[in-house]
């Protein structure tokens, strides 16, 4: 096996020309930032004027958080891992004061026991996206 390998996600959100959905490097899987895009929905709109890399799930922070974590689940499954293999999460919220508690409630539905290390910060996120999550998972190859 190569030292690093692109993780392809056939049932995940649309691919991007400028990044890999995830990279496996040895026993670690590094997932790019994921948002609440619906799987199988193509990019739409005009670049620079409302362009989206796919169709964003309707609803608020709760819906976007669930879809984002489900997208991470799909990505990790494509790499042979699960949400339980995540060791570190970085979360970016458009409005941390407004959305943190609702995001955290949904997050805790997925990570009930031994949750991963996590950082959550506020960030200006593209278009109508309220949340972006990236993660690192540990899943030995052998």
Model-derived regions: residue spans:
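N-terminal presequence-like segments and the immediate start of the first folded domain
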Residues: 1-70, 74-87, 93-142
């Amino acid at each position: 096996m190569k030292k690093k390998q692109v993780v392809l996600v056939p049932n995940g959100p649309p691919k991007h020309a400028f990044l890999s959905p995830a990279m496996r490097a040895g026993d670690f899987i590094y997932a790019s930032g994921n948002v609440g895009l619906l799987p199988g929905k193509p990019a739409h709109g005009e670049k620079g004027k409302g362009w989206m890399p796919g169709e964003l799930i309707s609803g608020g922070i709760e819906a976007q958080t669930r879809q984002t974590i489900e997208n991470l689940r799909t990505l990790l499954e494509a790499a042979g891992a699960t949400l339980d293999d995540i060791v570190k999460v970085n979360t970016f919220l458009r409005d941390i004061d407004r959305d943190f508690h609702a995001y955290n409630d949904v997050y805790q539905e997925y990570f009930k026991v031994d949750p991963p290390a996590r950082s959550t910060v506020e960030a200006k996120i593209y278009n109508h996206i309220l949340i972006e999550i990236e993660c690192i998972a540990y899943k030995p190859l052998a």
